Amino acid sequence: LGIHFEPSILNPGGDLSQYSTLATNMLERDVRHVVGCYTSSSRKEVIPLFEKHDALLWYPSHYEGFESSTNVIYTGAAPNQHVLPLVEHLLAHHGHRAYCVGSNYIWAWENNRILRESVTARQGSVLAERYFALGETVFHQAIEAIIEARPSFVFLTLIGTSAYQFFREFRMACRARGIEQAREIPVASCSLSEPELQAIGEDAVDGHLSSSVYFCSIESPANRRFLDAYLTRFPEGPTASADAEASYNAVWLLARAVAAAGTDDPRAVKTELVRQQHLDAPQGEVWIDEQTFHAYLTPRIGRSNRNARFDLVSEARAPVRPDPYLVHSSSRFEAATAPSLRLVS
C-alpha cells in the first residue's frame, strides 16, 4: 500500500482514570487515529475527547450495542452479530429456560436485557439474573441456586477473573453431584475466547459455548497467514482471539482508507473507508457499513475443547449487516437481525 505507520503506544493498565488522560495526551499531539479500548467503560470515557478533537477511535471489540458516534469505527461485533445468533442456537438445541449470571456492569446489563427480550418473545423464560461486583470470585450460593433450578443453559456475562472462577466452581459443583455440566447445563458466553480458555484451566475448559465472529480454528488461507504472522510477532503468546483479529482488521482498513484518500484526515478516511474498502480478513470478508460505521461480520458458534480451542458448531452463510440498535428486528426479535446459522459440525 505504500503506507508506513508509526505507532504511539500508551498503556492505561486497565485503570479507567488513565484512559482520558492518555487519550488527551495523544490527541493533543495531533494523533488522528487510535486503535484501542476494550471495555465499554473505557470506550465511553474517551469518546467525547475524540469528538472534541475530530479524531477517529477504531474500537476493536465486540460490545453491547445501542451506541453510535461519528468519531468511532466499530470493528468488533454488534449485538445482532453475537447475542442474537447465540439465542437462536440455544433455543434450537438446548431449551427455553435461561439463567443469567453477570458482572454488575453495562456489558452484562445490556446483553442480558437483549437475551431476556429475545427469549421471552419466543415463549422461553429467564429464571433469574444474578449480578456480581467486578472481580468477584465467590459464587457458591449462585451455583447452588442454578443447580437447584436446572435451567436449559446459563448465559454468562461475567468478565475477567470472575468468569474464569465461575467456570471452575460450576464444573466442580456439577461433577460432585454427578451432573455432566457441559451437556446438562451448558454455559454460553459472547466473550469467551481462546486466551480465556487457557486461563480457566484444563479441569473446566471444555464444553462451553461461545458466540463470536472469529475463532482460531477457522480454515482459510487468510486465517493461516494471520496466525503465522501473529505467532511470529508474539511467540510467547497470548493466543490470537476475536479481539486480536478485530484490531488487525482495523489497522488494515485504516491503512487502505488512508492510501485511497491520500491523507490521514479523519473525514477523508471515513469517506474512502465506506466507499470501497472490503478486506479479506481472517474471519472472511469484512467491510464497514456507511450508515452505522460498524462492520459487516460473520457470526459463528464454537464449543470449547480440552486443547483450549473452539470447534466450530455453526456459522452464518455470509457476512451480516451490523444492527447496533436492533432496529431491523421485529418486536419479537424474529427478523433480519437474528441471522440463520448453518451447522458445520
Give the location of each predicted region.
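Extracellular/periplasmic bilobed ligand-binding domains
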Residues: 115-116, 120-211
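Extracellular/periplasmic periplasmic-binding protein-like sensory domains
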Residues: 170-246, 328-329, 339-340
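Short, charged, surface-exposed loops that flank catalytic or proteolytic processing sites
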Residues: 3, 239, 259-271
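Beta-alpha junction/loop-to-helix N-cap segments that form part of ligand/metal-binding clefts
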Residues: 2-65
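Solvent-exposed, acidic/polar segments of extracytosolic/periplasmic ligand-binding ectodomains
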Residues: 281-345
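An alpha-beta-alpha
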Residues: 75-131
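Periplasmic-binding protein-like
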Residues: 26-38, 58-60, 99-101, 150-166, ...
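Short beta-strand elements in bilobed, periplasmic/extracellular small-molecule ligand-binding domains
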Residues: 1-13, 69-71, 119-136
